[in-house]
């Protein structure tokens, strides 16, 4: 049996290659783990927007999950775009017996250009069925607000939101600060609440760039890869923070809109 760490992404396909399973698999590769995938939706998108979303039939999603489970030793998995309540329930039912080790949930709700990627009625399904399975959840500020109903306006409300997500079942919570509380801030702060109650902040410089398509996918994929390699959570979080900071600060300038991050940048530092 190979000793190469094996990972799984359960997410949508991005025809533009900047987000979704494409971003996840690129990140897995760069971090030295073998990536498998379960496609939940096919999207027609590029740097300018999302033009079509086709959810994958439930039986095909189930078949993909079974195929990966029956042939690979997955030690860490991540969930990205699921899209519908039915898909959420299908995936959650399969994952309830923990076939893929540590589970990272990136609650993908809105594309970089503003297009909704999660149906409104699916939000309650995500809260009910997936949050209790999350070893780590990685919402940005708008996603955290949608999951809790709490308006984030300061550090106190961030802490309240993180605690609420834990009460809903997530063990460890990372609220990403790309959508800053202070638009003039030169720092990007991510707030982390660990299962043991420790609360701390990871900081990085903020870069004035439109090329941030797929940042959430890339961050959670790097975190998943590090956990698959056996890294402690705090170490894995720091690596993911460093990876996405490098990816954002060395843009590829591809496309005519919100371009992708640079998945090669971290390895070239």
Where are the model-predicted features located?
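Short, small-residue alpha-helix embedded
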Residues: 145-146, 209-233
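Charged C-terminal helix
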Residues: 55, 234-269
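Conserved phosphate/ATP/ADP-binding segment of small-molecule kinases
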Residues: 120-199
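Short pre-catalytic strand/loop immediately N-terminal to key active-site residues, enriched for Gly-Thr
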Residues: 10-16, 199-213
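Phosphate-handling active-site elements
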Residues: 32-36, 198-200, 226-240
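Conserved N-terminal subdomain of the carbohydrate kinase-like
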Residues: 2-9, 26-112
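Glycine- and other small-residue-rich loops at beta-strand/loop junctions that grip anionic moieties
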Residues: 13, 79-80, 115, 212
């Amino acid at each position: 049996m190979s000793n190469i760490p094996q990972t799984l992404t359960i997410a949508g396909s991005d025809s533009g290659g900047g987000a979704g399973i494409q971003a996840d698999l690129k990140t897995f590769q760069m971090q030295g783990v073998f990536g498998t995938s379960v496609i939940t939706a096919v999207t027609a998108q590029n740097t300018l927007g999302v033009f079509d979303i086709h959810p994958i039939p439930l039986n095909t999603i189930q078949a993909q999950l079974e195929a990966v489970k029956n042939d690979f030793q997955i030690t860490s998995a991540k969930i990205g775009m699921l899209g519908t309540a039915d898909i959420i329930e299908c995936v959650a039912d399969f994952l309830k017996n923990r076939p893929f080790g540590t589970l990272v949930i990136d609650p993908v709700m809105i594309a970089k250009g503003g297009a909704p990627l999660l149906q409104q009625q699916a939000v309650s399904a995500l809260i009910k069925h997936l949050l209790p399975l999350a070893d780590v959840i990685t919402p940005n500020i708008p996603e955290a607000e949608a999951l809790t109903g709490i308006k984030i306006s300061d550090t106190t409300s961030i802490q309240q939101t993180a605690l609420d997500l834990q009460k809903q079942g997530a063990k460890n919570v990372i609220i990403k600060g790309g959508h800053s509380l202070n638009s003039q801030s030169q720092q990007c702060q991510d707030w982390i609440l660990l299962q043991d109650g420790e609360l701390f902040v990871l900081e990085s410089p903020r870069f004035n760039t439109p090329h941030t398509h797929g940042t959430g996918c890339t961050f959670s994929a790097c975190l998943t890869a590090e956990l698959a390699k056996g890294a402690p959570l705090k170490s894995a979080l720091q690596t993911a923070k460093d990876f996405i900071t490098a990816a954002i600060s060395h843009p590829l300038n591809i496309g005519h809109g919100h371009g992708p991050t640079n998945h090669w940048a971290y390895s070239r530092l």
